[in-house]
Amino acid sequence: MKRNLNENSTRSTAGCLPVPLFNQKKRNRQPLTSNPCTNDPGISNASDNYDFPPLPSDWAWEAVNPELPPLTKTVNTGQIPHSVSNSLRSQDSLSKPIQSNAGSSKSDWSYRDGNKNTSLKTWDKNDFKPQCKRRNLMTNNGINSGPINLGAQQQKQLRVSESTNLPNQRESEALRQTKSSEIPGSTMRSLDKNSTLQAFKPNFQQNQFKKKMLDGFQEVNTLKKEASSYQLKLREKDNSLRIISAVIESMKYWREHVQKTVLLFEILAVLDSAVRPGPYCSKTFLMRDGKHTLPCVFYEIDRELPRLIRGRVHRCVGNYDQKKNIFKCVSVRPASASEQKTFQAFVKIVDAEMRYYTSVMNEV
């Protein structure tokens, strides 16, 4: 709590800056300023009523005891006696660094008070650090907490000390900026995380888009490959040997209309005669398809003719000789049931293809 003194107190050294005597041996104290006020029984010595600037030893003491209540400075409006002013003049060299520290503490703490909008007379240990305890006291009065009613020489010294405190103030401002940047560390980290997440999201979306594009290109490439392979297959089919499924009547018809092209026919017919041997290792037999009959010949050059059963359906593949009216077979075997079922469909497909082929060949 702030201790207020009566204006008519016997204390005449208000406004002076005493020198603290810390870390020294115990001895009979001689007050440097004046005797304490007799009206205030709670005051034991002069050093209890004054707030000293932060010194290294004082900082260590506050770090050990952070929860001590702040000390307040009492100001007496009385005049300074001549004996005390002489002692103050002898201690000008000590007062200058003290005032420099006070100036730096003022520039540091006033900024924080302006930001937090707190009262200058209260202090909370949860809001501030222990090192700032005495700085708050010094900034409550600022330069006015210094000696009042000093002479012109003291005021000049204060001005000189303030001019020398400018670099210290700049350093303190730099430290304050670094501290203020360090205080909201969690928020800054969260913002950094959010920024990284936000920066990561478009990158992730771009990667997905690229993957989709690559997948699309791969699909297109596969389609192109499939199309090219299909075209190759078609070309192979175009260049490959085609067997024309036909009955006896249609075979004779296509052979008559397409004379310049070599055609290989496939017919399904019933064996209507016995197999007879012929010249040049040949065997002859007769095939019947409804009302139409067709003589066939098979030359046993590289293989023998398998055993054929009269009255059964056989599959014969070969070339038709229109001049001799004979079908030269290269393959003869019994037809399966599936071939017999699908043969009529094959004949219709072949008729359509042969009509298109003959129309194109006639235009050429």
Curated annotation (Swiss-Prot):
Residues 1-51, 70-189 are annotated as: Disordered. The keyword Transcription regulation does not apply. PANTHER family: SPERMATOGENESIS-ASSOCIATED PROTEIN 22. This is Spermatogenesis-associated protein 22. It is found in: Chromosome. Component of a multiprotein complex with MEIOB and RPA2. Interacts with MEIOB. Interacts with the complex BRME1:HSF2BP:BRCA2. Meiosis-specific protein required for homologous recombination in meiosis I. Signal peptide: none annotated. Residues 1-13, 30-48, 73-108, 137-169, 177-189 have a biased composition (Polar residues).
